[in-house]
């Protein structure tokens, strides 16, 4: 039987909508049950305090969970499943939208794809002349602090898809989104390579921990 603490977030959601729940209540809704001597709301609150945010929580590995009394493999798998479900939702949504509706939508998608990755991943969104999404691909993966990018492969894929424009993105697992000299250099190389085939580079976004940098917003593209 559900306890009162487990019912409260559920009832609030049914009454006022899912957006009305706080981070603690939303987490409690997924955890469903607490641990011996600790109700689910208290457990959710302690977990968020430990990891700092939902981002920190969903990005954590199992070793970081071991210090929490009552949190075993089952709850860890459940939380990682939530993160993967969100990533796939945004991936499907991006494929099914007629066009990129806003920079905010693009950012949300990229954060869902790259947040929490332990290695640098370089992702490219390929667009047609009306900026409809043709495909998004993780073209390159690297180490904790570096990813090798080959501009010709980006152009080759764009030609194959008949793309008119691309959006570049990669993550910084360190959490700091500020671009390095190497990031700026490879962006320039990709732009020059794309220009030969009349393909526009609309932006290069770097995704950090709760922050991002847009080359277009800074006037670098």
From Swiss-Prot:
Q: From the UniProt record, give one GO term of the biological process aspect.
A: proteolysis
Descriptive protein name: UPF0758 protein YicR
Superkingdom, natural source = Bacteria
Query: Which stretches are transmembrane?
Result: none
Q: Which family does it belong to?
A: Belongs to the UPF0758 family. YicR subfamily.
Q: Has keyword Zinc? A: yes
What positions does the record give for the motif labelled JAMM motif?
Answer: 170-183
The residue ranges of the MPN domain are 99-221
Q: Which InterPro entries match?
A: MPN, RadC_JAB, RuvA_2-like, UPF0758, UPF0758_CS, UPF0758_N, UPF0758_YicR
Residues reported to bind Zn(2+): 170, 172, 183
CDD domains on file: MPN_DUF2466
**Key word Membrane present in the record?**
no
Cite the entry's keywords alphabetically. Hydrolase, Metal-binding, Metalloprotease, Protease, Zinc
- Which GO terms fall under molecular function for this chain's record? metal ion binding; metallopeptidase activity
């Amino acid at each position: 039987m559900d306890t009162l603490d487990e019912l409260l977030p559920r009832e609030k959601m049914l009454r006022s909508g899912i957006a009305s729940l706080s981070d603690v209540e939303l987490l409690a809704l997924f955890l469903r049950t607490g641990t011996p001597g600790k109700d689910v709301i208290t457990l959710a609150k302690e977990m968020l305090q430990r990891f700092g945010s939902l981002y920190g929580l969903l990005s954590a590995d199992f070793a970081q969970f071991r210090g929490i009394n009552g949190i075993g493999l089952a709850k860890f798998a459940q939380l990682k499943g939530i993160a993967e479900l969100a990533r796939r939702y945004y991936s499907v949504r991006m494929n099914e939208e007629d066009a990129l509706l806003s920079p905010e939508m693009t950012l949300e998608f990229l954060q869902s794809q790259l947040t929490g990755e332990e290695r640098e991943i370089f992702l490219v969104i390929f667009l047609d002349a009306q900026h409809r999404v043709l495909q998004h691909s993780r073209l390159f993966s690297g180490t904790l602090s570096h990813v090798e990018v080959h501009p010709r492969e980006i152009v080759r894929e764009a030609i194959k898809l008949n793309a008119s424009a691309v959006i570049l993105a990669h993550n910084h697992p360190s959490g700091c989104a500020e671009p390095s000299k190497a990031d700026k250099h490879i962006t320039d190389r990709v732009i020059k390579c794309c220009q030969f085939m009349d393909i526009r580079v609309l932006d290069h976004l770097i995704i950090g921990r709760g922050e991002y940098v847009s080359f277009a917003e800074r006037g670098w593209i």
